[in-house]
């Protein structure tokens, strides 16, 4: 019997995913209909997920049963008018083919430990939706296996304490520029936990909650679906056009794809300095704002505001969105720092969707969310990279490609570090020890 925070089938709706995946799906369908990609699961935390391999495979294979039904398509047409009739017709016929597109197995790390491996291969627009679905599946299976004893009351208590703190601090500090969207789908404790959390938020702080990145829950709770674009859009262009032009082309193509709607630019695929070099007057004018996802939010925001001012653009007409590992305390510090200097908004995920406070099990181990990502590794057979403004978030399988990318964008290339990284990558080369059934 599943506890109240879990359900037998994890993904029960094709809309139980992040808004930006469908946005990028349309853009890939329009501009790059034959582009082939590969995604890889990267587990950053110390969790050994190899024991979950069969359950993960089973849940992913269940995705083949999902369909976009007429009511869901009508909802998308209403809430996302930038999605074209042609694309919605495509969604009507869309099917997942996980047995052909997703490989689930186990590999051995350089340290000799076993770890879960999930690889996604296929045409970009046919495989792009797997990312958030796979991550939601893995997180819930892990928590159902090892943390099923956590009661729903613990989630309520943690949320209520956080909202009490938020209410107190907003009043004490007289902060009036705090608004946020819920963005916890990929790393949620479980679907039921995310749903419970959103129900609490809309009851306690409806005036602060802008919406959610989850289409299914937005529809169920009549909230605004929120989302624009992710790193993979810029990463893919590293293989689709001349590498030195990739970021500019990605920015231009995004505007073209939605006629200027969804105009929030993500700045850290190559790094903030490289981004600003490409974010010229035309682009800075056309885009409604920018999103921070790594590095110091204060240094980043100062650079963005200075850049707008250097172009003769009033930064108070633009929106700065912060989405990097936020809690309420950090968000309020950002609000105070940028008050009156720009419009501010936040996307908050794990802090709301996967925090059980100081809950410990009978062995004295405190609950911690799993840290993982599913990121594009190749596009049309060529490597792609995310450099980031935070070294721990950098991702690339090919050190030579990464060095070339940095050089093309005028970033420092540390040869000694590159050599050591190459040696480390060789030591960490994955050895598959269990093939896909």
From Swiss-Prot:
<dbReference type="InterPro" id="IPR040727">
    <property type="entry name" value="NAPRTase_N"/>
</dbReference>
<dbReference type="InterPro" id="IPR006406">
    <property type="entry name" value="Nic_PRibTrfase"/>
</dbReference>
<dbReference type="GO" id="GO:0034355">
    <property type="term" value="P:NAD biosynthetic process via the salvage pathway"/>
</dbReference>
<dbReference type="InterPro" id="IPR041525">
    <property type="entry name" value="N/Namide_PRibTrfase"/>
</dbReference>
<keyword id="KW-0597">Phosphoprotein</keyword>
<dbReference type="Pfam" id="PF04095">
    <property type="entry name" value="NAPRTase"/>
</dbReference>
<comment type="similarity">
    <text>Belongs to the NAPRTase family.</text>
</comment>
<feature type="modified residue" description="Phosphohistidine; by autocatalysis">
    <location>
        <position position="231"/>
    </location>
</feature>
<dbReference type="Pfam" id="PF17767">
    <property type="entry name" value="NAPRTase_N"/>
</dbReference>
<dbReference type="InterPro" id="IPR007229">
    <property type="entry name" value="Nic_PRibTrfase-Fam"/>
</dbReference>
<comment type="pathway">
    <text>Cofactor biosynthesis; NAD(+) biosynthesis; nicotinate D-ribonucleotide from nicotinate: step 1/1.</text>
</comment>
<dbReference type="GO" id="GO:0005829">
    <property type="term" value="C:cytosol"/>
</dbReference>
<keyword id="KW-0436">Ligase</keyword>
<dbReference type="InterPro" id="IPR036068">
    <property type="entry name" value="Nicotinate_pribotase-like_C"/>
</dbReference>
<dbReference type="GO" id="GO:0004516">
    <property type="term" value="F:nicotinate phosphoribosyltransferase activity"/>
</dbReference>
<keyword id="KW-0662">Pyridine nucleotide biosynthesis</keyword>
<comment type="function">
    <text>Catalyzes the synthesis of beta-nicotinate D-ribonucleotide from nicotinate and 5-phospho-D-ribose 1-phosphate at the expense of ATP.</text>
</comment>
<protein>
    <recommendedName>
        <fullName>Nicotinate phosphoribosyltransferase</fullName>
        <ecNumber>6.3.4.21</ecNumber>
    </recommendedName>
</protein>
